[in-house]
Every structure is written in C-alpha cells, then in structure tokens.
C-alpha cells in the first residue's frame, strides 16, 4: 500500500453519519476507522507500506511508478520461493482472519 493511500469501504463522512448520525464528525470517524497505511499494516491487511517520493506520488509520477515497480518485482521474487498450494493456503488463512480483527 502506498504511504499516503487510504483504505476503506466507506468514507469517513458516511461512517460518521451511520455511527453518530452526524457527518460533521468525519475527523473522529477517520481516526476510528484507521484508514492510513501504517494502521492497515499493523492490522495485517497489507504486506508493506511503500514509501512515496518527497511530497507524495502525485508530485513525481515517474519516481512513484519506479518505486512501485521495484516493490512489485521484489515481492513477486519473494513469492516464487513458495509452492502454489502454500500460497493459496496462506491467502485463505489470511482472508479468513480478517473478520476477527
């Protein structure tokens, strides 16, 4: 997951509207939802936080693309060490654990 990306099934405004019936509490909702990459990594929903170029990926697309490419290549190389059945079992176990966060 890119360093400054967010991960969520609903916007903080939607969450605040549902939980507190007040969309103006979106900042509180965003904090509670743990949307940022470091929190998502801590929850074991992702494998890595990919550091972005200074100022964010939107300021230097070429460098961001190169960083992402290198990360993908490295991770694919690491995965080659595993048998397909092992990878599928690891994926299944991980996905089944998401509900117990």
Summary of predicted features, one role per range:
Residues 1-73, 77:
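Conserved catalytic cores of soluble enzyme domains
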Residues 62-101:
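Intrinsically disordered, low-complexity segments enriched in small/flexible residues
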């Amino acid at each position: 997951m890119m360093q400054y990306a967010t991960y969520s099934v609903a916007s903080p405004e939607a969450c605040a509207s549902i939980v507190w019936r007040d969309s103006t509490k979106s900042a509180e909702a965003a904090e509670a939802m743990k949307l940022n990459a470091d929190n998502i990594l801590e929850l074991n929903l992702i494998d890595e936080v990919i550091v972005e170029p200074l100022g964010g990926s939107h300021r230097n697309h070429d460098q961001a693309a190169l960083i992402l490419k290198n990360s993908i290549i490295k991770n694919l190389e690491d995965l080659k060490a595993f048998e397909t059945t092992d990878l599928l079992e690891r994926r299944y176990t991980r996905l089944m654990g998401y509900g117990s966060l």
